[in-house]
Curated annotation (Swiss-Prot):
It comes from Caldanaerobacter subterraneus subsp. tengcongensis (strain DSM 15242 / JCM 11007 / NBRC 100824 / MB4) (Thermoanaerobacter tengcongensis). One of its GO terms (molecular function) is structural constituent of ribosome. Belongs to the universal ribosomal protein uL13 family. Part of the 50S ribosomal subunit. This is Large ribosomal subunit protein uL13. The lineage of its organism: Bacteria, Bacillati, Bacillota, Clostridia, Thermoanaerobacterales.
């Protein structure tokens, strides 16, 4: 008996909506990454992009446990000498909560061509409204 290998032409993609209100950032991000990779499907094949689309709403209401809001920093380099910048997560949550979820999920995806293709299927919105009603997304509850 041969093992099943998914082909890119056989992949059927669904749309899911996840409400991030009151959810812990890391736990939420790992579940989203699993859906983007397609690991929740029995047809999962590591070298084929079998994942689904994910729309995250209420990104501004995601929770960080402990004192991470004050202690954790997002660091980035501008490309100039002395250009290592850091922003406290508390400030980042106020200005760009969509980026916090995007960055957490991106770190859990493969660091290759497949991962770059997978992250494009993640749509994150600050409030409860999103513009993907036409795709008829299915509501997904994550604990």
């Amino acid at each position: 008996m041969k093992s099943y290998m998914a082909k890119p032409s056989d992949v059927e993609r669904k749309w899911f909506v996840i409400d991030a209100e009151g959810k812990v950032l890391g736990r939420l991000a790992s579940q989203i990454a699993k859906i983007l990779m397609g690991k929740h499907k029995p047809t999962y094949t590591p070298h084929v992009d079998t994942g689904d689309f994910v729309v995250v709403i209420n990104a501004d209401k995601v929770v960080l446990t402990g004192k991470k809001l004050e202690d954790k920093y997002y660091k980035y380099y501008t490309g100039y000498p002395g250009g290592l910048k850091q922003i406290q997560y508390k400030k980042l949550m106020q200005t760009k909560p969509e980026f916090v979820i995007y960055h957490a999920v991106k770190g859990m995806l493969p660091k290759n061509r497949l991962g770059r293709r997978m992250i494009k299927r993640l749509k994150v919105y600050r409030g409860a409204e999103h513009k993907h009603q036409a795709q008829k997304p299915e509501k997904l509850d994550i604990e």
